[in-house]
Design a protein with these regions (language model features):
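Charged, low-complexity intrinsically disordered segments
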Residues: 26-163
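Bacterial N-terminal signal peptides
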Residues: 13-22
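A generic signature of intrinsically disordered, low-complexity regions enriched in glycine/proline
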Residues: 6-9, 21, 46
Length: 163
């Protein structure tokens, strides 16, 4: 009798858990967030996104700008730094608008099936979304077919990130 009750309790708990997680699993496969946070961290494991560069500056200034430790916001398991209070406020209001695609990893690398770090000065904005790349050579390849690489990366991000 105890075994049956335990099984029923476990099954009930499992069903409730799946019901709670189900909507998240049904969400679009590609987003800028990453599951569980940490995707945006720099390779030195400091938990600082984009190596301390201001994500809003790519859109407002048209170039990478180093953020300040005076303007910091934690989001999705990483610390984001900003060049100004205005940029910090913009990010807080719409983080998904300013955060880089594919969790901040190299967009070309994701398209090719690899999780690769980035250099903040290798970037592009396509359809109001920020894409970062590994280095100048990779950026050249990326720029030859941005739409094609975005399509490939969108289709493979979830499987690549789980490797």
């Amino acid at each position: 009798m105890n075994i049956m009750n335990s099984i029923k309790r476990f099954a009930g708990t499992l069903l409730l858990s799946l019901a709670a997680v189900g909507p998240a699993l049904a969400a679009p496969a590609i987003n800028t967030f990453g599951e569980g946070g940490g995707y945006f961290s720099d390779p030195k494991r400091t938990d600082t996104a984009i190596r301390g560069y201001d994500p809003v500056a790519y859109f407002t200034d048209g170039k990478p700008v180093k953020g300040s430790d005076k303007f910091v916001h934690e989001w999705m398991g990483a610390k984001w730094q900003f060049a100004s209070q205005d940029h910090l406020d913009k990010f807080k209001a719409e983080p998904a608008k300013y955060a880089p695609q594919y969790g901040g990893y190299c967009a070309y690398g994701i398209a090719e099936g690899h999780v690769v770090k980035i250099e903040p000065d290798q970037w592009s904005i396509v359809n109001d979304k920020l894409y970062l790349n590994y280095d100048a050579d990779v950026s050249k390849k990326w720029k030859q077919d941005k739409a094609g690489y975005i399509k490939k990366a969108d289709a493979s991000f979830d499987s690549v990130i789980k490797k």
